[in-house]
């Protein structure tokens, strides 16, 4: 929803429809099973796929021989992903494909009463490596959430061992984690540095010297007061400060750790003379 909200505020005239074809608990095999009914029927032109968290499994960790279990999970994910690739390639309406490397399973955060599945994130990373290789081979887009989010978790845990962008169960990100992922996705699309709007007014001449993504009219400079009419073609992204459903993280927490505001949410006014 954060990605959709960014598009809506920054590109209000863009004819865009976004469909969620996923269901919680999915893995690559489920995506294959429901591709026709969930995806193809909607006739998308741009497809974003994410899997890995559930494909890496749960029950086989913290047991002797877990490495064999991990190998089996990766092999099965690879097999099912191969089937998914063929379904995607056969759908000629799909012009662009992006693969998302899963958010991490946080094995390091200190969470009371929550078991740590040691080695699970390494399995996820192996699946992500497979996704990256396929993306490069097929000319598809690729965004790796895992690496950056692991680095961010490490940073915040230096001062608070209970802090994480991966939620209260090591798996499901709170709103802060979702905001981080939205930032990484939008940055990968090349949107860093795109302003909401920028304008420069010369007060003495009562003239707009520069207008970017906006229009300035009716400039007045009277009684030590400058006034003008401002029409922007975009709106700033509203960063929420409220958690949901008993969780702790908010989008505001995320923008303290990633430069979303500086790179993607600047609305700048400059006045000279």
Which residues fall in each region the model found?
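Alpha-helical cap/lid subdomain in secreted, periplasmic
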Residues: 2-17, 26-273
């Amino acid at each position: 929803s954060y990605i959709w909200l960014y598009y809506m505020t920054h590109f209000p005239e863009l004819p865009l429809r976004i469909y969620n074809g996923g269901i919680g608990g999915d893995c690559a095999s489920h995506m294959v099973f429901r591709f026709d009914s969930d995806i193809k029927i909607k006739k998308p032109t741009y497809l974003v796929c994410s899997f890995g968290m559930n494909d890496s499994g749960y029950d086989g960790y913290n047991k002797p021989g877990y490495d064999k279990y991990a190998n089996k999970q990766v092999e099965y994910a690879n097999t099912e992903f191969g089937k998914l690739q063929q379904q995607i390639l056969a759908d000629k309406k799909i012009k662009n494909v992006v693969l998302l490397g899963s958010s991490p399973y946080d094995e390091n955060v200190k969470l009371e009463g929550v078991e740590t599945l040691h080695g699970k994130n390494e399995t996820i990373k192996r699946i992500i490596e497979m996704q990256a290789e396929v993306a490069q081979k097929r000319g598809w887009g690729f965004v790796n959430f895992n690496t950056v989010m692991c680095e961010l978790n490490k940073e915040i845990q230096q001062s608070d061992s209970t802090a994480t962008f991966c939620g209260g169960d090591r798996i499901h990100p709170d709103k802060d984690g979702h905001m981080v992922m939205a930032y990484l996705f939008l940055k990968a699309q090349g949107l860093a540095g795109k302003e909401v709007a920028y304008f420069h007014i010369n007060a003495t001449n009562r003239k707009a010297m520069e207008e970017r993504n906006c229009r300035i009219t009716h400039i007045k400079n009277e009684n030590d007061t400058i006034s003008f009419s401002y029409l922007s073609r975009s709106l700033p992204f509203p960063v929420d400060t409220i958690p949901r459903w008993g969780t702790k993280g908010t989008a505001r927490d995320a923008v303290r750790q990633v430069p979303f505001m500086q790179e993607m949410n600047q609305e700048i006014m400059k006045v000279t003379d």
